[in-house]
């Protein structure tokens, strides 16, 4: 049972991580989509208490990001580039919910805290748990 004061934070369900036909960052062999049904059930169960996040490339990479994007220059694009869009099914579920964009792997910060209204109980879900989910 989900507590009335618990929020769901959905981490980076984006095209760049879903579409392995063109994205080297995508989950291999379309495995991203094996989570679609479970994710949709979870998002619906939380109702209005869901916030979505998007990874976007930093406008001007600094520090470790400089070397990182030497290996991945094709992903150093504007935040509104379609590769950083939420996947279609996620975008549909996200309508009417806050979407927090961050240029870091971890999404925790004041913007996300405000979006979940300072809730102390949260559930975090995403696909690449070894990266953005874990660091959030």
What are these regions (language model features)?
Residues 129-136:
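Short glycine/serine/threonine-rich phosphate/pyrophosphate-binding segments
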Residues 79-129:
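Internal catalytic-core helix/loop-beta-alpha segment
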